[in-house]
Amino acid sequence: RDGLKITQGEADYLEECTKLQRQSALWYSHRKGRITASKFGAVCHTSISSPSQSLVEGILTEENCRRRGIPALDWGLEKEPCAREEYRQAMKKTHVTFMIEQAGLFVNPLYPNLGASPDGLVSCTCCGDGLIEIKCPYSIRDSNPAAAVGRANFYLEHSEGDVKLSRTHAYYYQIQGQLAICDRP
């Protein structure tokens, strides 16, 4: 659609102006009509001939991403700053130059119908650039996250003696989309 076309300069300006994400009216309006990375898992698993109506509505309407009053969503938004700071502190112990920067809405001019809003951009001299997507699951709010690893429908799994993001979970699709759209390795 022509209405979604964007130059690189406009994309850079949009990302800068939307770093407050949910507190930015511009963030909401520019998500409308774009398939955002948070929807990639659902898009990849919906029927092409008969797509999920709620998925289509979620992409086409601005109001759908303004939802509040959902305990799991509210919990995640409330805990995100603390989780970000704990992650930053943990990384600084072994990565002296580690930094997290706020991120806005990224739109790649080559694919203007797609968008991504990671929770932050990360960088350090030894590891390079990346991004962070923070998840604070309401479902395990009263337990140790390590106990949930490998549980059915949980997004983390044991793999080769380590804990990894499940490649079949919607969060995997979200993060892969974010990495591509934000042009992070």
Region locations from a protein language model:
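Conserved catalytic cores of phosphodiester-cleaving nucleases, focusing on short active-site segments
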Residues: 87, 118-122, 126-143, 151-157, ...
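C-terminal folded domains that constitute the principal catalytic or ligand-binding module
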Residues: 162-185
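Short amphipathic alpha-helical face segments that pack within enzyme cores
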Residues: 82, 119, 173-177
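Short amphipathic alpha-helical interaction elements and helix-loop-helix interfaces
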Residues: 93, 97, 126, 181-184
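A short acidic/basic microdomain associated with nuclease active sites
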Residues: 88-113, 118-121, 130
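Charged, glycine-rich intrinsically disordered N-terminal tails and low-complexity linkers that flank
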Residues: 1-86, 90-94, 141-165
